[in-house]
Curated annotation (Swiss-Prot):
Keyword Mitochondrion belongs to the record: yes
Extent of the signal sequence: none
One Pfam match: GEP5
Function: Essential for respiratory growth and required for maintenance of mtDNA. Required for cell survival in the absence of prohibitins.
One GO cellular component, as annotated: matrix side of mitochondrial inner membrane
GO biological process: mitochondrial genome maintenance; mitochondrial tRNA 5'-end processing
UniProt KW keywords: Mitochondrion
Subcellular location: Mitochondrion
Protein's UniProt name: Genetic interactor of prohibitin 5, mitochondrial
Major location category of this protein: mitochondrion
Family the UniProt entry places it in: Belongs to the GEP5 family.
């Protein structure tokens, strides 16, 4: 199937006004050995964008044509051909640890604490708490609702819950990543505002009853899925290799001004890691800026 689809897509890619670096990246990604699922994950949205581009060209709709090309540029360099940062891989590796230690706020406990706090609601769910706090301290409490799957039961409780150097690196890198995106809201996907990442456990009724443990565990799973999608799929950091590739596009003297502007718009939300090779110090992030005419 992949070879047949590529036979249709590759000539269309070559006919676009995109820079050769983007064309090579696209071609390499499509023709590399990968599962059918992974291939479809790229080929389906790419086909849609190329169809939009061709239709816009026939209608001489410049705006729609440029929008389609912008989408292809962004998806090629930021998603399809962009290696995940180290803390994304660690997120997957230590998923169960994050699931059992992800910070939460139990609304029942929150209501009960009002009397102790002289009638004041002492919530920890505000973004300011997450922006100021040491993230390691936020992860110190293990939640009682997520059960350890049988496949992990062979590991000791210490192994499952210990704050190893790798896990500390992961948590602090996630904290830096979240704080960076909050501080640079112009980078967010569709101008989305990032809420407090803690899990909220609501009361079900006026009696203060909470949901069954299984439903609460699902809240943690959904929140981690949302966090991963927000940081690594919708708005991922640009890899150092891709930053260099795009820099070569911007400073290519043969590139016409219109095409350079197209790439500038497509890459307006670019940011990357300052210390991508670090394995001890948590990752830091900075906005990528290309000073071009």
């Amino acid at each position: 199937m992949a070879s047949q689809v590529n036979a249709l897509l590759l000539p269309v890619i070559e006919s676009t006004p995109l820079h050769q670096i983007t064309k090579v990246a696209l071609t390499t990604t499509l023709t590399s050995k990968q599962s059918d699922y992974k291939f479809k994950e790229i080929a389906v949205p790419l086909t849609k964008s190329l169809q939009l581009y061709e239709k816009a060209q026939r209608r001489q709709d410049l705006r729609a044509s440029l929008k389609a090309l912008e989408s292809i540029i962004y998806q090629t360099h930021f998603q399809w051909n962009n290696p995940l940062p180290r803390h994304a891989h660690l997120f997957q590796k230590h998923y169960h640890f994050l699931l059992t230690h992800w910070p939460f706020e139990n609304h029942r406990d929150l209501v009960d604490s009002i009397a102790v706090n002289n009638g004041k609601l002492n919530s920890t769910s505000s973004r300011s708490v997450w922006l100021k706090a040491d993230w390691i301290t936020l992860f110190n409490v293990k939640n009682p609702w997520v059960q350890t799957p049988p496949s992990l039961m062979r590991l000791s409780g210490t192994d499952l819950d210990t704050f190893t150097p790798e896990r500390i690196f992961l948590i602090n890198s996630l904290g830096n990543h979240y704080k960076f995106l909050i501080a640079n809201s112009h980078l967010s996907y569709n101008h989305k505002k990032y809420p407090s990442p803690g899990v909220q456990i609501p009361v079900r009724n006026a009696l203060g009853e909470v949901s069954p443990a299984k439903q609460i565990a699902q809240l943690f799973a959904r929140q981690l899925s949302h966090i991963y999608k927000s940081l690594f799929i919708e708005n991922p950091p640009l890899s150092p290799e891709n930053e260099l590739a795009l820099t070569a596009v911007f400073y290519d003297e043969t590139v016409e001004r219109r095409l350079r502007r197209l790439y500038m718009r497509a890459c307006a939300r670019a940011y990357t890691t300052t210390n991508a090779d670090s394995t001890t110090e948590p990752l830091m992030f900075h906005c990528t800026r290309w000073e071009v005419d």
